Amino acid sequence: MTGPLQRRAIADGVWFSRIHDPKFYHNSISVTIITPLAEGKTSAAVLAAYLLRMGSRRCRDMTELECRLADLYGAVLDTDVSRHGENQLLTFSIAGADDRFALEGESISRGCAELLGEILLEPKVEGDAFPEEAFRLEQQYLIDTIEAEINDKRSYAAQRCTAEMGRGCRFALPRYGTVQETLSATPKEAYDRYRELIRTARIEIFFSGCGSPDYAEEVFTKLFDGVERAPLCPTPQRLPLRAERVTELAEQLPMSQSKLVLGFRTGLPQQRRVRTALRVMTALLGGSTGSRLFTNVRERLGCCYYCGARVNLLTGILLIECGLEEANRERLQSAILAEIADLAAGHITPQELSHIKLAFQSSLCSIGDSLARTEGWYLSGLLQGDPITPQQDMEEIASITAEEVAAAAAALTLDTVFFLQAVGKEDGCDED
């Protein structure tokens, strides 16, 4: 990338960001609706996002929508639903060739911005509700998606541990909602939730690529100029900093290997440098094939099939996820805790710290290879409140000391142990 993020408000609670990178031959425009996860409203928001991607008042079906995309030199439209800390994110994006490749001098970026804005703000409706037939199709698709989550046993175990640690907190709510919530939703409720989000949610718009964002900014400024906005400013929930006791939970499922998840509180550091040290410590502990958990616990002790660590800086939760034979459970858990204690004691060699920093450097250098990853990087930074460039992050990581890594490990407190016991292989299923 040639420069950092340039961002300005174009409406109340609506922000337009520019990221210029001349090495690409195309541009990406994304609109992310950011709203706190809310029990009873999550599924309706997802259904609304799925229905918006089906067309608009001027594109009454997928055939017409595909024709519009074809006229824009094969532009690609995408929709994504995700969770970031306490927030639900609904992202709509379009990618198209740069204007200089237009055969008749037209602006492809303007056309892409107009189509994306049309899909977002001029949905296809019947009266004051989404079309019944389209709603039922998307409702069943969402139910199937939610019910299929348990098929990924590793992800399911991590979600169960996180939900227990976040009991009573917004971040513990499922990103898609529940089957019951989805079944009880109606086309009108989904449309009402959509209108509520357009009025109250924080909205981040990105234009990234080689071209000029001026047309896109003009389009969205005019569009939101006609939208009634009353953005909400939710108060962040107070999250636990340390574990008061260890909660142990267990479930059984038909599968070929058991899963063990250890959930730790990290102290929820607020200073960026302390958070960076926590990231480095997590990577050193279990973030790569050169980490302690992989080298010592998996390879040397041989007491698990996999063992890795990841941290969520917004919730202050670090998870260690393992696949194992049940007979190795106690030995595995003891070995993991011993590795954390060893890091906390400061037993960190310059060589292993250097290797982890090089791994970070490689990963951060690759962010600029994709416009989607670049936008995701800056959006994540905005949600954390301190966006920096990947280069700035590399420089800070390079300066982290072994003492800072040890302090991050010493701040960990074990909160929850979730064990998913294998009770026989499920027919036709291989979750490993």
Task: Report the location of each language-model feature.
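His/Glu-rich zincin catalytic helix
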Residues: M1-A75, E104, T178, Y191-N296, ...
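Active-site glycine-rich loop that binds ribose-phosphate moieties when present
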Residues: S184-D192
